[in-house]
């Protein structure tokens, strides 16, 4: 039985989404249990409360506070110690749940998760990983998507190791290919850090720690050239939000053109099956649920504006991660890559080596997680 702790108060909409999605998820997953964490009086007022309370595989866990989307990391971490977000993560720490899911403030979630669960041995910084649709009809996993704006080559190696474990667990690809996001495929392209990262990833591939494809460009993300794309959080966040903007623009453009006049509306009816398939294939809601990798517990982030369908997808992704032992897979891959990680740390300048394990929570940036 897989038990998931759900921050029922998180997200832009809160219980109206999380409770409906939770009920649908329970109906689709007979071997799953949910701990719904939230303010009892708010949850009790919801129309689905009675069904969920009566459900044999659902339990309400009380939390007196809520982390809002506008709360600073300091407020979320130091003042709201009984928030639904923190209590949900505590369920993982205490062993009552295998994974936590929240649609709340991304920066606060990362800060609280890191404070409560701590990072895995051998990992300096947690990273945010999510999926983007590709031309192969599958998905490309990408990290980091915003947790770390400044990275060393060692961090990118850690991301590659953790991301490979994620893809192996979620997509069931034993040896996922890894691409390093760059401005060109050639090894001579990019800045010094990217070149060093390329050499480090190649060494990791030679030692069997990862399956390194080489450098990839931005268009390769959507071609599906590799199963996993690794980059720093600044680049990843820009790429993610650019793709979101482009997708919305294309959707709005198609809708406007088919609504132009009676003839185009008739054409839309004829083209409906194709348009419907197109929309489904590129529906970002299907890929909702980003993993916070590198922690001593599993945490997944849902998009704050997720609807019921999207939040259910995030629950399903968290369920798959727990069922396929993602945390143990990450630990095993880190242990296997430990000699290379230690060697990479030893090669860092003294000041970088000292600073590597520490990341101020203020450097965590908010990013949508699809």
From Swiss-Prot:
NCBIfam families assigned: plsX
Species of provenance: Polaromonas naphthalenivorans (strain CJ2)
Subcellular localization: Cytoplasm
PANTHER family reported for this sequence: FATTY ACID/PHOSPHOLIPID SYNTHESIS PROTEIN PLSX, PHOSPHATE ACYLTRANSFERASE
Family matches, as Pfam families: FA_synthesis
Organism classification: Bacteria, Pseudomonadati, Pseudomonadota, Betaproteobacteria, Burkholderiales
Protein name, UniProt field: Phosphate acyltransferase
Domain of life of the native organism: Bacteria
One Gene Ontology cellular component: cytoplasm
